[in-house]
Amino acid sequence: MALAEKIGGSQSGFVDMLNKRLKEIGATNTNFVNAHGLDAEGHYSTARDMSIIARELLKHPKILEFTSIYEEYLEKNDGSRIWLVNTNKLVRFYDGVDGLKTGFTKTAGYCLTATASKNNFRLISVVMGEDTSENRSSDTVKMLNYGFNTFKINIIKTKGESLGKVRVEKGKQDKANIVLLNDATEILKNTDPVTEYNFNLKVNKIKAPVKVGDIVGTAEIIDSEGNIVDEVDVTVEKDIKKANILDYMLRNLKTIGFGKSILKQN
């Protein structure tokens, strides 16, 4: 509650921020009326929305450093210690599970939004309304087993791979190498063959200065049947500074054919 008041100015202000962010990420069947998550009229969500929220949270992987801890001791000022145990037992008992959040209320039952990663393939599972904590764990195991046994991830191109060059306005370099900001992937069934892919690069007009990590467009990944299987943000391979007057002079000289001879004389 203190954190909500710190971030939102008040609990209601924080709730407004939450609901606004939910709409932005596509969790349109969720509405919060309080900051603590306990049952209340008008306070609801769905399994699908919880998976969307989890996916957004995983864009900040540092969270897994905390959610993957099974047990820890907190030391008090008097030297005594408090033993804390993760209520997500799968962190310890299922290989690859490293998060995310359990929950329980009388209305919602025992809930678990879990995530696990194996062979660079990460899954998110959501169970709600379970009768016991044991059932929420066992049903989560069934879902994760099904996912890992049925599907695989095909990495089409890796983060940082080049997709070609595009023009840069007012830059020290007039062209930039465009690279993927993240891996381009497709989820396939284990029995599906890998197909051929094409890339449709959609880049905004780039104007210097521009830095590595700045999103300058997207790349559509298209399979052999013409389906868009992924769309990945793209960035520049190297920082490009804004050109100064000397850069323009040298560029113009090279364009008319004198640049090389002048540079040699210097």
Enumerate the language-model features and the residues they cover.
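Domain-terminus/edge residues, biased toward the C-terminal soluble/receptor-binding domains
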Residues: 27, 42-44, 48-266
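Acidic/histidine-rich, surface-exposed loop or edge segments in extracytoplasmic proteins
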Residues: 1
